[in-house]
Amino acid sequence: MIVIVTGMPGSGKSRIVEEFEKRGFPSVSLGDIVREETVKRGLELTKENVAKVSIRLRQELGQNAVAKLAVGKVRVLLEKSPLVVIDGVRSLDEVGTFRGAFPEEKIIIVAVHTPPRLRFERLKARGRHDDPQTWEDFEERDWKELRFGIGGVIAMADHMLINDGSKEEYEKKVKTLVEKIIRGLNRGGA
């Protein structure tokens, strides 16, 4: 089984990934693949360089470029684990790449929605090198994500978590959903 986790930056995707990892299931981050590719190209890990490489990869290899680069990693992990989580899928082309590469696997899409103002505050607090520090940067990043096609992936989600309350409320939602998916794995569904 493959669980694709999607959502806008700062929505809470990583918390879902962490919950699966706590339970022994591995993950592949498409964002990490772009960051690795940025370094491979001899560029410093800056917000601008990562964004440029992300766009350049799609120009060179198609809209599903990052997914293509991830397929090998996912394949290796599926040999060792019955469930692999893929974090950061941003287009239906990427979903299609995974469906095509793994036709025998059940693929579940989990989307997280968090209101923009709340995401902005969380991203500012997170402090990762590529996180926006101004509302204008935040909006620009959101539009970039939407141009990649993330809205289509969110619309096609099998499960949607709304992350607009307390951390404790979201934790409960995440644990409940992860348990449901794992139960489905054990029964052949979800």
Curated annotation (Swiss-Prot):
Has the keyword Ribosomal protein been applied to this entry?
A: no
Q: Which Pfam families match?
A: AAA_17
> What GO MF terms are annotated?
ATP binding
Which keywords accompany this UniProt record? ATP-binding, Nucleotide-binding
**Which residues take part in binding ATP?**
7-14
Which family, according to UniProt? Belongs to the UPF0200 family.
This protein is called UPF0200 protein TGAM_0868
Question: Which organism was this protein described from?
Answer: Thermococcus gammatolerans (strain DSM 15229 / JCM 11827 / EJ3)
